[in-house]
Each structure stands twice: as C-alpha cells, then as structure tokens.
C-alpha cells in the first residue's frame, strides 16, 4: 500500500489559483483616448488585445484610428491594473533607437549611389510625379556627392501615390525597366524625369521616356518599350510599395537616415546637420550604416 505524503495531499486539495486578471478595459481606454486626442466621432477606434511588452510590468496595446481608407496607429503601454497608460516608445539603450524601422528597410536590388560601405545609409521613398520629391531629389543629387563623397550611400525606393498622381506608377515601372537594363542609366532617368516633370502627362509618358532613351547611354529603346508595355517590372514596384506600407509611410518624400524617419522636403542645411550628427554618433555606436564586404580569394598555396 502506497502512502501519499501529507503535504502533497494537502496541495492537491487546494483550489487551483487563477492568474490575476488584467484591469484593462477597452471601452474605458477608447473613451479616454478619444478625449485625450480630440478624436472626432467619424473616426473609428479599433483597439487590439493587450500583449506582453518589453517591460514586464506593462502590457502593450495597439490602437488604430480609421477614417475612410486611411489608418493611423498608436501604441500605448498599460499598467497591469489598467489605471495608468503611457503613450510613446520603449527604447533599449543597447540597440539603435531606430532598429524597428531599420529591420524593415530592405535595400538589396534597389537603385543606389554613393560610397559602398558608407557609415550612413539614406533610403528615400519617392514619387516621380510629386513636386516635393522633385525638390528633395535635386537637394540630394547636388549636395551629397560633394559634401559626403565617402560617407553616405543613397537607396531609391518607389512609392507612387496613385490616388493623386495618375502617371507616377507607370513612371516607376519605366524606371525599374531602365534599372534592369542598365543600372547606371537609372540615375540619368531619375534626374531627367524630375527635370521634365511639368511636361509629362499620362498620355505622353511613354513617348517622353522613349525620347529620353535616345539620349541615354547603353539603353535599347525597343527593349524599354516592350518592358513598359508588358509592365515587366510592376512586381518590383509593388514590392517597394508594400515595404513602404509596412513602414506606415503615407506621404512622399519620406527618407530614413540610418533609420531616422524624415517626412517631407528637407532643406539641405537641416539634412546636412542630421547626417553630420549621425556620422559623429556612428564613430562610437557602429550600429547602423553599411559594412563594406571584403572579397577574399582562396590562395591554393595556403592549403
């Protein structure tokens, strides 16, 4: 006959302890946030279920403000009793403060200029029909190679705003066709299309692009025309748009300087200060930018 230890028997008879319930109340949070941010009644507020955050004593709650087809997201951190909320971000001092966006920025196979292995990477999401993008493009192309010839690498990402710019996406497709045929010619096209932006319409876009091809080096106009007609590079443009949406971009130009988000047209003086500050920071931090790859060729004599 087996005897169950008395302590074990007593524990077995105790009622199972339930996990303490969160004091979080969605309705109360919505009412509070609507008042806090002066949200108009026409805006729908959708509140996600709480989830663990980087801080053990706080839960993360994502709140979505929906107005028609537009959505704006906010993150709140809620105390376990549901009485205190923090609006903003939680930063880890051991990581780049812009790590979340840096992890989403994919630059492989994107048009680029500047020094490979540069300590500062600038990624710009742009629209060929956007007037502000035209101004920012001019700022970047004229100033960066002179001021930071070895320190900045620029990557271009398509983000055409189709709802308001009817020829922006076809132009993006054309740009990717050119990049696919001759990567160096992409930047000629980039500069040309912004310079001639006011002359282009949805009806004359193809003819204008083919005119450009006649003056560009190492471009086959017939091949370019076929690529545009078949929309052979539309998937590349769509992938760039999807990346922009994942980053919650809703305006152009939007730039990321080593992950730091800059929205709108930045005057050169302001942008230069940001880049200079980032260069100084990276001297010690070394948590962003590119690391130039070394090509090591095996030496058979070492075997």
Residue ranges and their predicted role:
Residues 104-120:
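A short beta-strand-turn-helix
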Residues 123-214, 247-250, 277, 282-302:
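Structural alpha/beta surface segment adjacent to cysteine/selenocysteine redox centers
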Residues 73, 120-121:
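Short loop/turn microsegments at loop-to-beta-strand junctions
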Residues 1-4:
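Positively charged n-region of N-terminal signal peptides that target proteins for export
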Residues 19-87, 210-303:
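C-terminal cap of thioredoxin/glutaredoxin-like
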């Amino acid at each position: 006959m087996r005897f169950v230890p008395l302590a074990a028997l007593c524990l077995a008879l105790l009622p199972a302890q339930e996990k303490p319930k969160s004091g979080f109340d969605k309705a109360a949070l919505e009412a509070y946030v609507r008042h806090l941010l002066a949200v108009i009644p026409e805006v729908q507020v959708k509140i996600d279920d709480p989830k663990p955050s980087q801080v053990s004593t706080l839960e993360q709650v994502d709140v979505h403000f929906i107005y028609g087809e537009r959505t704006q997201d906010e993150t709140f951190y809620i105390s376990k009793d549901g009485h205190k909320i923090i609006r903003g971000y939680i930063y880890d001092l051991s990581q780049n403060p812009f790590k979340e966006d840096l992890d989403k920025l994919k630059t492989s196979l994107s048009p680029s200029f500047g020094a490979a292995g540069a300590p500062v990477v600038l990624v710009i999401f742009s629209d060929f029909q956007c007037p502000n993008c035209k101004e920012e493009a001019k700022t970047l192309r004229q100033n960066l190679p002179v001021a930071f010839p070895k320190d900045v690498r620029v990557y271009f990402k398509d983000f055409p705003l189709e709802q308001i710019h009817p020829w922006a996406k076809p132009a993006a497709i054309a740009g990717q066709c050119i990049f696919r045929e001759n990567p160096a010619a992409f930047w000629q096209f980039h500069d040309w299309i912004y310079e001639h932006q006011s002359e282009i319409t949805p009806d004359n876009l193809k003819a204008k692009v083919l005119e450009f091809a006649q003056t560009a080096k190492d471009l086959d106009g017939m091949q370019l025309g076929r690529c545009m007609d078949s929309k052979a590079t539309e998937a590349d443009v769509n992938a760039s748009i999807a990346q922009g949406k994942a980053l919650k971009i809703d305006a152009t130009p939007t730039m990321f300087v080593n992950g730091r988000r800059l929205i709108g047209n930045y005057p050169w003086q302001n942008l230069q200060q940001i880049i200079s500050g980032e260069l100084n920071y990276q001297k010690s931090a070394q948590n962003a930018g590119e690391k130039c790859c070394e090509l090591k060729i095996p030496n058979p004599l070492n075997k």
